[in-house]
């Protein structure tokens, strides 16, 4: 069996499997073919892969012969009947592409579709990458914000700590809370799930409560549609907190749908000049109407940084974690003898498969 690792297209810097993960496959007599230069942006050279037991090949050779092809985003290779594709393909949005691959005979696993269960945690790419996104969102905000994060008391005077508002207490939000607190800021958090209140408070942040939320506990960390009355109360509470915030980090997304607007233009107008918004939902429309994906815009004196791919700014660690998720998933579909076995009754195999 041959497992192929493709090089991602710029601006993506991650790679789906780093050199240290190769040995786990080669010891099962699985050949690992890596596209030349695939790991360079993640600080993993072709020589590193060769030393780990991989072979360096072209993308065409991988397309023509690999039984399993690993990537992060959708590959641009020709699809062969029977090939297994594994990545993070945004299957809920890219339905046409997934349908085309299925028609060409590919078996497609898009790992963001994995059920959010205890058994799936070791292969949960959403969580491993969101953890990085939450951490880097705060550092990005601190870099863009022209003031201190912590309180300072000096002979020249006192500086008040930055006020950070985090919308969404999923994996990214919780890491953002922890990082913002470490930097000395005052943190407020909003989430539609009252169940996360204890987690938020344990990290030292204030939880903004809004009664009447629809139960989102089973949504795998995503937002769910709420009632009109709740949305009205939500908008009012968020507007009040946003007007006092120096930094806002938004993380709210709904599977298969456009991200909800949580910060209106009127709210942005009410914010202090020099404030910063980091929108992690930019790729699905953004949590503000002014967000532009992969761009920084300044409106009404507020910087709005739209970036849903912050893990790519930490390519080495992000690739290591992503690759570990991939290896754990491969254990479900490759047996100890290195043979491909697709157990269609396995809830994780069935859940991750992207089909028409």
Outline where the language-model segments fall.
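Phosphate/diphosphate ligand-binding glycine-rich loop within oxidoreductases
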Residues: 68-143
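Adenosine-phosphate binding glycine-rich loop
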Residues: 112, 118-155, 161, 288-356
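Short glycine-/small-residue-rich Rossmann-like dinucleotide-binding loops
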Residues: 73-74, 89-90, 253-255, 281-282
